[in-house]
């Protein structure tokens, strides 16, 4: 399979650069996996597609204000994007500067704060701050909006580029499928008899990195930390026992659950994952998926194609463009049921 198989034309006007007035105000494109049939709905209509006894699995990671601006003590402006918090004072970060800081260099943070560059790990810099990292980021950090939202972050992004159920700080990108849910909709879902469970996957900036190989089988995924607790395993077993479906909210929830079931058996898991899901890979846990519209040639589009089938996914994306759906993080959503016999690009006539 080639990366180019997952390309499509997207007008710039369809890239959502701001959230809608209401979280639930998005549109919902429903793709029936077994038939490929499409339905054009509004996001609250998701209720019509959920059944009593289903289990929705959400990612409760919390986006940290991971972008910092500052300068080297020796002079020269720079930008820091925290990739991973290592402990209370140390992070791994991307540093953008005219000249990369050397080990021992001191970084002065705009708004107050100081860090030392203590090591370099390939493209990432290990920084040690003089004060606790998370309070510092909350005080002077900026929300790390994706590169395709080409505007400075605004005060509203602190709330809207965050799910209402976010708990565990550590992500530098939002699990965007969850942005559509407000408390009122969650209450209606619960009232219908749909259970919920929470995993954690701290989304890294690598989620926006382009695939730089021709054959997707040659691509190596970035690592992200996740946790699937025993409570989630128990909830899924109970869901199966009552005949319910496991509905993953977002590709990060899919990657969490499928990482914890790599040998075909779901087990509690905590640690790094570099799982890469593309057409041909089986799914062991997830039956249905809520997800946003993803970038052309992205690993997330490949995951959706593995779940729904390649021709069905690309046809759905073509329909979304034709009908003016809004794309990417602040855009519209899909609800997809798993295709029991998904085809890949190589299966096309």
Curated annotation (Swiss-Prot):
Q: Which keywords, in A-to-Z order, does the entry hold?
A: Cytoplasm, Queuosine biosynthesis, S-adenosyl-L-methionine, Transferase
Q: Which Pfam families match?
A: Queuosine_synth (PF02547)
Q: Which InterPro entries match?
A: QueA, QueA_dom1, QueA_dom2, QueA_sf
Output one GO MF annotation: S-adenosylmethionine:tRNA ribosyltransferase-isomerase activity
Q: In which pathway does it act?
A: tRNA modification; tRNA-queuosine biosynthesis
Q: Where does it live in the cell?
A: Cytoplasm
Q: Which GO terms describe its cellular component?
A: cytoplasm
Task: Give the highest taxon in the source lineage.
Answer: Bacteria
Q: Which reaction does it catalyse?
A: 7-aminomethyl-7-carbaguanosine(34) in tRNA + S-adenosyl-L-methionine = epoxyqueuosine(34) in tRNA + adenine + L-methionine + 2 H(+)
Q: Say where the protein is mainly found.
A: cytoplasm
Could you say which protein family the record assigns here? Answer: Belongs to the QueA family.
What is the annotated quaternary arrangement, including any partners?
A: Monomer.
Q: Known HAMAP family for this protein?
A: QueA
Task of the protein: Transfers and isomerizes the ribose moiety from AdoMet to the 7-aminomethyl group of 7-deazaguanine (preQ1-tRNA) to give epoxyqueuosine (oQ-tRNA).
Q: What is this protein called?
A: S-adenosylmethionine:tRNA ribosyltransferase-isomerase
């Amino acid at each position: 399979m080639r990366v180019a198989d997952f390309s499509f034309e997207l007008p710039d006007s369809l890239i959502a650069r701001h959230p809608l007035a209401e979280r639930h105000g998005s549109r919902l494109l429903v793709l029936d996996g077994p038939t490929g049939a499409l339905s054009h709905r509004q996001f609250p209509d998701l209720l019509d597609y959920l059944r009593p006894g289903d289990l929705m699995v959400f990612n409760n990671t919390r986006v940290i204000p991971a972008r910092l601006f500052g300068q080297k003590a020796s002079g020269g402006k720079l930008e820091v994007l925290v990739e991973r918090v290592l402990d209370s004072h140390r992070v791994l970060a991307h540093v953008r500067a005219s000249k990369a800081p050397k080990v021992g260099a001191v970084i002065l943070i705009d708004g107050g704060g100081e860090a030392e560059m203590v090591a370099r790990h390939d493209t990432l810099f290990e920084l040690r701050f003089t004060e606790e990292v998370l309070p510092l980021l909350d005080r002077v950090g900026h929300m790390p909006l994706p590169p395709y939202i080409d505007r400075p972050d605004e005060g509203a992004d602190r709330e809207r580029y965050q799910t209402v159920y976010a708990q565990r700080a550590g992500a530098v990108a939002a699990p965007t499928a969850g942005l559509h849910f407000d408390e009122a909709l969650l209450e209606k879902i619960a009232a219908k008899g749909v259970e919920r469970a929470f995993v954690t996957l701290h989304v890294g900036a690598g989620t926006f990195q382009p695939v730089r190989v021709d054959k997707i089988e040659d691509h190596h995924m970035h690592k992200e930390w996740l946790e699937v607790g025993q409570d989630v395993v128990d909830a899924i077993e109970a869901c199966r026992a009552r005949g319910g479906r496991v509905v993953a909210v977002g590709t990060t929830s899919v990657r969490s659950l499928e990482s914890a079931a790599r040998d075909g058996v779901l087990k509690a898991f905590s640690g790094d994952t570099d799982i890469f899901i593309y057409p041909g890979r089986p799914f062991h846990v997830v039956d249905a998926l809520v997800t946003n519209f993803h970038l052309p040639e992205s690993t997330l589009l490949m995951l959706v194609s593995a779940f729904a089938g390649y021709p069905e996914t690309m046809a759905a994306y073509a329909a979304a463009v034709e009908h003016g759906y809004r794309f990417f993080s602040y855009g519209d959503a899909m609800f997809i049921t798993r295709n029991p016999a998904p085809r890949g690009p190589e299966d096309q006539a």
